[in-house]
Amino acid sequence: MALYELTNLLSIDDLTNEQILNLIKRAIDIKENNNQIKRDDLYVANLFFENSTRTKMSFVVAQNKLGLKSIDFEVSTSSVNKGETLYDTCKTLEMIGVNMLVIRHSQKQYYKELENLEIPIINGGDGSGEHPTQCLLDLMTIYEKFKSFEGLKIAIVGDIKNSRVAKSNYKALTKLGAIVHFVAPDKFKDDEFNNYKEFDEIINEIDVCMLLRVQHERHESQDKTQEFINIYHQQHGLSLPRYNKLKENAIVMHPAPVNRGVEIDTTLVESDKSVIFLQMKNGMFMRQAVLEYIIAENNL
């Protein structure tokens, strides 16, 4: 059975609204009752071709809590450095008995090269494409607070052009009934979207302030200067004055890693409205739910 005949999680578009809500409720159930399935007969390989702390480690912890045998693929010591293709690497893992892959890669839609694989893939982030499990943990965190998405006003603020998080979250949130606006400097805007606002124009109206990391590694050198950082924080960062204009029950989110003093004042990272570290905690529970879903749907 080829890849696209399997149930994968490559894009948030792979899930219906019902499936998204079921995953949220299952993740909350695992969080509250510690009742995850146990499967010690399956092997999962984690292939991270880009740096990661939260996504990679939460997948590893989630896999261990499910009893899965977690394999850490070391790019630096693999045959990738001898010129082996991504397909050949993944096909090798399939042939030696790996049952599932979690992949992060700098290439957008890298999975299109893997259509002849016969094991399912969970996308851990594809360049500036999508990040479906980050999206799901964000949705879980919002749902825990508001119990619904319908009519919520959400601002996604920052490096829209380079953000896979922005793209996945916009798709899912609008599909679920939320009203999403973008806030960004002109050079960080993505022409795919047209619903841009000024931060100060909507700061007192939004329920969710979703900040994005300025992805310095994807930018030109002038975007890394202290002058740029100061201007960015002044115009598009969550400063204390802006924070004080938020609605009483609003929440502040960030997929992390956080550039303190750039996207958000360092004193606000663990403020009352911030759920940044809760997002990280929820990520492990959501990834358990996703792993369960992939196992069940593919009869592994």
Curated annotation (Swiss-Prot):
Write the Enzyme Commission number(s) for this entry. Answer: 2.1.3.2
Query: Quaternary structure per UniProt?
Result: Heterododecamer (2C3:3R2) of six catalytic PyrB chains organized as two trimers (C3), and six regulatory PyrI chains organized as three dimers (R2).
The entry marks the following residues as binding carbamoyl phosphate, namely: R54, T55, R104, H131, Q134, A256, P257
Q: Does the keyword Ion transport apply?
A: no
- Known role: Catalyzes the condensation of carbamoyl phosphate and aspartate to form carbamoyl aspartate and inorganic phosphate, the committed step in the de novo pyrimidine nucleotide biosynthesis pathway.
Q: Which UniProt keywords apply?
A: Pyrimidine biosynthesis, Transferase
Name this polypeptide is given: Aspartate carbamoyltransferase catalytic subunit
**Per UniProt, what is one GO molecular function of this protein?**
amino acid binding
Domain of life per record: Bacteria
Q: Which cysteines are joined by disulfide bonds?
A: none
Q: Which residues bind L-aspartate?
A: K82, R164, R213
Q: Which GO terms describe its cellular component?
A: cytosol
User: What NCBIfam families does this protein's entry cite?
Assistant: asp_carb_tr, PRK00856.1
Pathway the protein contributes to = Pyrimidine metabolism; UMP biosynthesis via de novo pathway; (S)-dihydroorotate from bicarbonate: step 2/3
Q: What is the lineage of its organism?
A: Bacteria, Bacillati, Mycoplasmatota, Mycoplasmoidales, Mycoplasmoidaceae
**InterPro entries per the UniProt record, alphabetical:** Asp/Orn_carbamoyltranf_P-bd, Asp/Orn_carbamoylTrfase, Asp/Orn_carbamoylTrfase_sf, Asp_carbamoyltransf, Asp_carbamoyltransf_Asp/Orn-bd
Q: Which reaction does it catalyse?
A: carbamoyl phosphate + L-aspartate = N-carbamoyl-L-aspartate + phosphate + H(+)
In this record, what's one Pfam family? Answer: OTCace
**GO BP annotations listed:** 'de novo' pyrimidine nucleobase biosynthetic process; 'de novo' UMP biosynthetic process; amino acid metabolic process
From which source organism is this entry? Malacoplasma penetrans (strain HF-2) (Mycoplasma penetrans)
Q: Which family does it belong to?
A: Belongs to the aspartate/ornithine carbamoyltransferase superfamily. ATCase family.
